[in-house]
């Protein structure tokens, strides 16, 4: 197919959409429902929200998209999307693309990234989290010298998080070997959040029936 300019399509990626203030996880970095509605108001006024079929036709057949085309995507299969986002889209006559992951929905587990998000949301002491992380690393065979090198390389603040938070995230996202980081994430989740992972998975992600209803909507 012919190449086309990325600027022809704006892609908006949504993750957590839910009532957050006053909820069980008030520290979670997500989008309040009222904020989602305001964003849709803005996008409907200033963009042409397109369907997945239009995007596919553009890619495969080079069919033109409308001016200021905008594609709404919803990642990770959260129950938020079924409970809050979908009814609002249907009410407005809008469509979006949903990308639920198979493993957490079918195997009743929690993705590491979601373990990390909720550990951080339930703690107001990042220094203690980093200390606990380092102690667990030592117990699982990571040397103190390695930890120091990792901290020097990855503890770099950005506009969203301080240095310790970035270090904590990076260590459990990709720096540590898979088996070690998976084990540490599970231990810290049980300690800090205190909800069995299987139960939490049922609460966080859509189930198979909800995915089927989503597809038929």
Please report, for each region that a protein language model flagged, where it lies by residue:
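Extended, charge-rich helix/loop segments that form flexible
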Residues: 2-4, 109-217
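Structural preference for beta-strand elements that scaffold enzyme active sites
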Residues: 9-11, 69-71, 95-97
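Conserved, mostly hydrophobic/aromatic
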Residues: 12, 43, 75, 89, ...
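Short, solvent-exposed loop/turn segments at secondary-structure junctions
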Residues: 16-19, 55-57, 77-79, 103-106, ...
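C-terminal domain-boundary segment and adjacent tail
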Residues: 28-64, 203-216
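Membrane-embedded segments
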Residues: 73, 77-85
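A short alpha/beta connector and helix-capping loop motif
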Residues: 84-102
């Amino acid at each position: 197919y012919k190449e086309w300019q990325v600027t022809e399509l704006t892609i908006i990626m949504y993750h957590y959409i839910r009532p957050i203030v006053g909820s069980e996880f008030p520290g979670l970095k997500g989008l309040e429902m009222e904020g989602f509605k305001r964003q849709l108001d803005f996008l409907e006024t200033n963009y042409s929200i397109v369907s997945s079929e239009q995007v596919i036709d553009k890619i495969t057949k080079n069919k033109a998209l409308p001016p200021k085309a905008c594609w709404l995507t919803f990642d990770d299969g959260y129950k938020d999307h079924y409970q809050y986002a979908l009814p609002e889209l249907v009410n407005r006559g809008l469509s979006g693309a949903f990308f639920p992951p198979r493993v957490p929905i079918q195997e009743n587990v929690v993705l590491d990234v979601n373990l990390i998000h909720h550990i951080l949301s339930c703690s107001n002491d990042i220094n203690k989290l980093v200390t606990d992380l380092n102690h667990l690393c030592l117990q699982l065979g990571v040397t103190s010298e390695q930890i120091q090198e990792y901290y020097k390389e990855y503890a770099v603040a950005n506009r969203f998080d301080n240095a310790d938070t970035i270090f904590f995230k990076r260590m459990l996202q990709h720096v540590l070997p898979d088996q070690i980081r998976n084990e540490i994430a599970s231990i810290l989740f049980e300690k800090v959040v205190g909800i069995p992972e299987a139960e939490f998975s049922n609460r966080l992600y859509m189930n198979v029936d909800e995915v089927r209803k989503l597809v038929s909507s």
